[in-house]
Amino acid sequence: MMESVAQEIILSCEINSIERGSLKNLSMVNMSCNGFNVSFDIIDSINIFSQKEKVKVIISKNRPSYSHDDFCGHGYIVTELKDSSLNNGNKYTTIISLYGLLVKIISNKESFLRTSQLNIMDHVYFCVKKNN
């Protein structure tokens, strides 16, 4: 389910895997979210997530409420890349930089920016909240 209310996008997700990142003390969390594949970098010392956990992702222009059980950061939408070489349509990769930590949103159907009404260089908050 993808909800979009006043520049706030809410995705229901399940964590598929947590992999070692390419830098020391960095992990990459991979999730399936309502037709999107979302991955984000997280520093090992603040990683509070586990595989198969159900979470909610919020991408918002306004600072959302959060608790110590959530991961939240803010940064900018850097780019959206389109790969038309796939046999079954277009693949879009949207990249958000949280001042160094990266968030990648991959869609095999349509542009995430177009469906969410966001633009490159928009300042956004990215939160991953545990379903309690």
From Swiss-Prot:
<dbReference type="GO" id="GO:0006351">
    <property type="term" value="P:DNA-templated transcription"/>
</dbReference>
<keyword id="KW-0548">Nucleotidyltransferase</keyword>
<dbReference type="InterPro" id="IPR031555">
    <property type="entry name" value="RNA_pol_Rpo8"/>
</dbReference>
<keyword id="KW-0804">Transcription</keyword>
<protein>
    <recommendedName>
        <fullName>DNA-directed RNA polymerase subunit Rpo8</fullName>
        <ecNumber>2.7.7.6</ecNumber>
    </recommendedName>
</protein>
<comment type="similarity">
    <text>Belongs to the archaeal Rpo8 RNA polymerase subunit family.</text>
</comment>
<keyword id="KW-0963">Cytoplasm</keyword>
<dbReference type="Pfam" id="PF16992">
    <property type="entry name" value="RNA_pol_RpbG"/>
</dbReference>
<keyword id="KW-0808">Transferase</keyword>
<comment type="function">
    <text>DNA-dependent RNA polymerase (RNAP) catalyzes the transcription of DNA into RNA using the four ribonucleoside triphosphates as substrates.</text>
</comment>
<dbReference type="GO" id="GO:0003899">
    <property type="term" value="F:DNA-directed RNA polymerase activity"/>
</dbReference>
<dbReference type="GO" id="GO:0000428">
    <property type="term" value="C:DNA-directed RNA polymerase complex"/>
</dbReference>
<dbReference type="GO" id="GO:0005737">
    <property type="term" value="C:cytoplasm"/>
</dbReference>
<dbReference type="InterPro" id="IPR012340">
    <property type="entry name" value="NA-bd_OB-fold"/>
</dbReference>
<keyword id="KW-0240">DNA-directed RNA polymerase</keyword>
<comment type="subunit">
    <text>Part of the 13-subunit RNA polymerase complex.</text>
</comment>
